């Protein structure tokens, strides 16, 4: 009994030390364990150095069961905890075990009651992800909090009779960029972090509203990352999502894009300014150029890193998007329409409608708009000059590329993947 009392006193002190560390430095950005089998000094096991919080490993076997059991007793109504105690206990527990759903649910209740600032939970989740970057419960709770934060922003703007609409829109975009950074850090800490990349897609769909500028910016910003992580399926899948979303924008096929909720959609939400949304969506982009550049990047990576199946799987998906683009435009073309010719995968000529031709004849303006009177951003305008759509997107060019790989490569894995890709190409074309 005496030993249990000593442990309880120790654990209570550790919880207070963790709470005190956050009060002394609210900018803590990383948490980690310090290997220490035994307590060698009579001091706190919580170490704070600049913005890094360390926990000596010897205390975990006492600390984690204590806060876990304490929270369960509270949920079973066998123990009363006041507001501050609940916040401290759940914070400590989630930093050590962020997949404990009950703790997140308790914090949801605190947020709903107005006791806990939801921004604090975003900070806690971000910190937990530095130690547990794949924690599914942390990502799930983060999405719930983000929805609530944006809802509060929207309601505040509506109550204010649109007085703060521009500020609200900018704040939402700031949240989007912050989430992109959180996802980037988590993806770098854990290979093929599906949860991180899935959250990134969710943010673009539900907070970014699938606007064109964000899609293109993300395509550009992740190029270097995937070049450094050539075996990361999730990272390449994210780029496939971006290109597919741009394809759906081009074809105006809303059925192929996940529906955006009314939370921030302009048509249903008067809070977001129509002109600001137009600036984000009326950006000229050259989809054939983007697809061709993706194929070039893929080929460079295949040459530099032979034998990686991820790269071949990605090439399949990009060529499939090219095939879909050519097929859709071929079906929608009319004899009266102004057209541009592109060689499709079968060697035939697809005549593109005048609507699509406007995309392939204009430079891709990332930060600006076609109308100089509607410049919504003061950033330096970035333009990518498009090259004519070449035969590099055709089936024949792909077959020549595969033959070159099979002839020159020395990697048996590369040869096997190339042969499998050729078989897939021929089946796609109906051979």
Swiss-Prot record:
Region annotation Disordered: where it falls in the sequence: 363-383
- Which terms are listed as keywords in the entry? Prenyltransferase, Repeat, Transferase
Which sections of the protein are PFTA repeats? 85-118, 120-153, 178-211, 217-250, 293-326, 394-431
Signal sequence span is none
What is the organism lineage in this UniProt record? Eukaryota, Metazoa, Chordata, Craniata, Vertebrata
What is this protein's gene name?
A: ptar1-b
Q: Does the keyword Thylakoid apply?
A: no
Gene Ontology molecular function terms on file:
protein prenyltransferase activity
Task: Please indicate if the UniProt record lists Iron-sulfur as a keyword.
Answer: no
Pfam families this protein is in? PPTA
Protein name per Swiss-Prot or TrEMBL: Protein prenyltransferase alpha subunit repeat-containing protein 1-B
Alphabetical GO CC annotations of the entry are: cytoplasm
């Amino acid at each position: 009994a005496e030993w249990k009392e000593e442990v309880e006193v120790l654990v209570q002190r550790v919880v207070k030390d963790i709470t005190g560390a956050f009060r002394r430095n609210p900018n803590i950005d990383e948490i980690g364990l310090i290997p220490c089998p035994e307590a060698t000094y009579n001091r706190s096991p919580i170490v704070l150095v600049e913005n890094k919080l360390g926990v000596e490993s010897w205390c975990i076997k006492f600390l984690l069961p204590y806060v876990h059991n304490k929270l369960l007793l509270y949920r079973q109504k066998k123990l009363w905890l006041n507001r501050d105690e609940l916040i401290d206990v759940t914070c400590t527990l989630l930093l050590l075990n962020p997949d404990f759903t009950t703790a997140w649910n308790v914090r949801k209740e605190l947020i709903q009651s107005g006791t806990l600032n939801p921004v604090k939970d975003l900070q806690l989740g971000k910190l937990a992800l530095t130690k547990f970057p794949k924690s599914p419960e942390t990502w799930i709770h983060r999405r719930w909090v983000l929805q609530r934060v944006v809802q509060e922003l929207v309601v505040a703007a509506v109550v204010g009779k649109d007085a703060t609409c521009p500020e609200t829109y900018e704040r939402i975009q700031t949240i989007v960029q912050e989430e992109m950074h959180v996802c980037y850090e988590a993806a770098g800490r854990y290979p093929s972090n599906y949860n991180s990349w899935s959250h990134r897609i969710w943010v673009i769909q539900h907070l970014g509203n699938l606007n064109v500028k964000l899609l293109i910016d993300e395509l550009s910003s992740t190029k270097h990352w995937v070049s450094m992580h050539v075996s990361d399926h999730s990272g390449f899948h994210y780029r496939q999502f971006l290109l597919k979303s741009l394809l759906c924008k081009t074809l105006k096929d809303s059925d192929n894009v996940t529906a955006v909720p009314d939370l921030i959609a302009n048509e249903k939400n008067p809070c977001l300014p129509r002109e600001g949304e137009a600036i984000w969506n009326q950006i000229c982009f050259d989809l054939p150029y983007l697809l061709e550049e993706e194929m070039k990047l893929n080929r460079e990576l295949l040459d530099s890193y032979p034998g990686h199946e991820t790269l071949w799987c990605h090439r399949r998906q990009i060529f499939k998007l090219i095939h879909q683009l050519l097929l859709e435009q071929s079906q929608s073309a009319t004899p009266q329409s102004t057209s541009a010719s592109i060689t499709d995968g079968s060697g035939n000529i697809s005549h593109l409608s005048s609507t699509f031709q406007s995309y392939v004849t204009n430079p891709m303006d990332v930060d600006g708009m076609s109308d100089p009177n509607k410049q919504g951003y003061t950033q330096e305008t970035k333009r990518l000059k498009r090259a004519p759509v070449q035969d590099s997107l055709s089936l024949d060019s792909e077959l020549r590329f595969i033959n070159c790989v099979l002839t020159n490569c020395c990697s048996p894995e590369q040869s096997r993947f190339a042969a499998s890709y050729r078989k897939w190409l021929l089946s796609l074309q109906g051979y």
